[in-house]
Amino acid sequence: GSHCKKCYQPHYEQVVLRLRSKDGGNTDLVLVRGKRVYTSKRDRPMPQYPAPFAMVLRKSLTNARLKAIEQIGFDRVLRFVFENSHGRFHLYVEVFRDGNIILTDGDDTIIQPLTHASYADRTLKRGIIYNPPPAAENPYDLNFESFKDLMNSSDRNLGRTLGGVLNLGAGVSAAVCADSGNKPEADIHEVDLTKVWDSLNLLLHGEWKGYLFKNEGEYEQA
């Protein structure tokens, strides 16, 4: 894996880890709490003096090797696993509204969160064990009967149930609705759940491949 050479905080909600690969090239791993995670090679201005959170990251992660990137269940929480001579460190990035970025040791004791926060079901502050948000429903774990039970017990429309209760998000739930011949605002008790289930499974388990669109009506498999 790549080594972390430098940590920056160019914005109060953004952290940039500069990674050096085995071939010597640099790539920025950009973490935006509550929004997105991506890599970039763009040359961007960095603060002259590091913010306190960036200083903590530098102390723990400088020259650490990135060993793994893991998703916590089906939730929008990523765990970046780093390791150096001082031990193992986890950097959790919560990619949902009001999410956070949290540095822990190898036992998940919080070294420093980007922002201290308290919620109804958890607290994020230095010195306590990191607990992710309550686990969301994982559609990969459902069978048709449990799927029907979840859908029939919902008081939301089809799109909101797929997006919220099944944790698919707006875009994926809209695709399932369209493929099953339904509108997102459809009454969940008036749709054919067998067709919705078939469309969901096609999306989750189908062998999808990319396509390159060249001109109107022309495309080829990438």
Predicted regions and their residues:
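Extended, highly charged segments
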Residues: 1-222
